[in-house]
Swiss-Prot record:
Record's protein name: Alpha-galacturonidase
Active site residues per record: 174 (proton donor)
A GO term, aspect molecular function: metal ion binding
GO biological process, one term: carbohydrate metabolic process
Binding annotation for Mn(2+): 173, 209
Primary enzyme class: hydrolase
Cofactor note: Binds 1 Mn(2+) ion per subunit.
Function summary: Alpha-galacturonidase able to catalyze the hydrolysis of the chromogenic substrate p-nitrophenyl-alpha-D-galacturonic acid (pNPalphaGalUA). It is probable that alpha-1,4-di-galacturonate (GalUA(2)) is the naturally occurring substrate.
Residues that hold NAD(+) according to the record: 11-72
Length: 453
């Protein structure tokens, strides 16, 4: 890697999960648009053919980046300046169990990748992989900056740091961005203020997918009262800022978000599908009819399987030149973060990092999501303060479970992970006997990934 004026050339990016048909394509697009950076992206994936296809797609863009698929993680990592991780831990068969087995016991999960029974078992598959990633990063590129996109985000980042304490890693999630966009729309509709999400200053604090905003300003204007008026206007009907909520599993009318604002007076800053899973006792996920009433969706794994098949077809067409790869800004910030870390301009954005005091009221080393300051070769968390006690209480079981699930996965302690399972708000509605039955069934479904337990 070398600097040439205001450009950086010869950058090496290692991509673990380089066969991705989502995050990898977004990265390709953003890199092609950023003229100040150039280099090589090494694509590693357990599905080598998927990585090879992405190599062809990336090189067809004829950008300032070269893409190389490799069949060993070591080759990808050796001497890397940046490491990007976006993987599916296990297969959709396991995710089918994560999401749908609990439905036999009346537990409905809208995503199933972060919290709840599904999030827990996904974590048990993920943590051993991240121990391996951290150890190989330590060996082959200890000074690289590591960007994680995989869920469960908090436990992925925690595993990287617990395994390799000197790692330079952070986790990125776009959920807060959509809430900032919503605040900008509220400012326009209520006060006639034209602004983008980047123009708004927000204080972000919480844990991934259960993040909150307690301060939002545009110039000297406090936007919390503006958002309050917006919520009052749209609470009953909802506000469909991304189109008809019925048209996509990923759309909602923000009614969960609005309800939480009415209950707690601060802005819940994630999508309704994610927020609802942390607080199932509010009834948002009581049954499919309740979900429809709150105007969001349960996302069936069958849809993910069908969508994957469509993306595979799309990737083959793009590799053959039969379909055009659209180069457009993805809305993600990974490339902006790289630029800042390379010294090409500072950046403030929200990321997931171990708590070193940036968030009060949460145990040290818990992975929290707050704003951070990015500058050359440094990410400095920004003091975010403390959530109201009433909101912090909602976080508590999830913060404790983050610690217990990690410890159980490292020790392969089935009894401890069952206690974490019992502590999850979803599971508390069950009798002990039913909780044990559900746990054992899900454990058996995941046994291929739980050898030695």
């Amino acid at each position: 890697m070398k600097y040439n004026g205001d450009k950086v050339e010869g950058i090496k990016i290692a991509y673990i999960g380089g066969g991705s048909r989502g995050w990898a394509w977004r990265l390709m697009s953003d890199l092609a648009l950023e003229q100040s950076l150039s280099g090589t992206v090494y694509l590693y994936d357990i599905d080598y053919e998927a990585a090879k296809t992405n190599e062809i797609i990336g090189n067809n863009l004829k950008s300032q980046w070269e893409y190389k698929s490799v069949d060993s993680m070591e080759e990808a990592l050796k001497g890397a300046d940046f490491v990007i991780i976006s993987i599916l831990p296990g297969t959709f068969n396991e995710m089918m169990s994560d999401v749908h087995t609990p439905e036999k016991f009346g537990i409905y999960q809208s995503v199933g990748d972060t919290t709840g029974p599904g999030g827990l078992f996904r974590a048990l598959r993920t943590i051993p992989l991240y121990v391996e990633f951290a150890n190989k990063i330590k060996k082959y590129c200890p000074e690289a900056w590591v960007i994680n996109y995989t869920n469960p985000m908090a436990l992925c980042v925690k595993t990287l740091y617990e395994t390799f304490p000197k790692i330079k890693a952070f986790g990125c999630c776009h959920e807060v961005f959509s809430t900032q966009n919503l605040i900008a729309k509220a400012a326009k509709e209520i006060e006639g203020i034209e602004c983008s999400r980047e123009d708004i200053r927000t204080n972000v604090l919480g844990i991934n997918h259960f993040t909150w905003i307690d301060k939002a300003t545009y110039k000297n204007i406090d936007l919390i009262p503006v958002y309050k008026k917006f919520v009052e206007k749209y609470f009953e009907s909802g506000y469909e800022d991304r189109g008809d909520w019925k048209e996509s599993y990923f759309n909602s009318a923000n009614k969960v978000k609005f309800d939480l604002f009415n209950k707690y007076g601060i802005i819940a800053a994630a999508g309704d599908r994610h927020l609802a899973e942390f607080i199932p006792f509010f009834g948002y996920l009581e049954n499919p009819e309740a979900v429809a009433k709150w105007k969001f969706h349960l996302t069936p794994v069958s849809w993910r399987i069908k969508n994957r098949e469509e993306l595979i077809k799309k990737s083959k067409k793009m590799a053959k030149g039969e379909e055009k790869f659209e180069i457009e800004p993805s809305g993600e910030e990974g490339v902006k973060q790289m630029k800042a870390l390379l010294g090409l301009g500072d950046l403030i954005t929200n990321v997931n990092l171990p708590n070193r005091g940036q968030m009060e009221g949460v145990e040290f080393n818990t992975v929290v999501e707050t704003n951070a300051f990015f500058t050359k070769d440094r990410v400095q968390p920004i003091i975010s303060g403390k959530l109201p006690d009433t909101v912090n209480m909602l976080l508590s079981p999830h913060v404790l479970n983050q610690k217990m699930i990690f410890e159980a996965a490292i020790k392969k302690d089935k009894e401890l992970v069952f206690h974490a399972f019992l502590n999850d708000p979803f599971v508390r509605k069950l009798t002990y006997s039913d909780a044990k039955k559900l746990f054992n069934e899900m454990f058996d479904n995941a046994r291929e990934y739980l050898k030695g337990w």
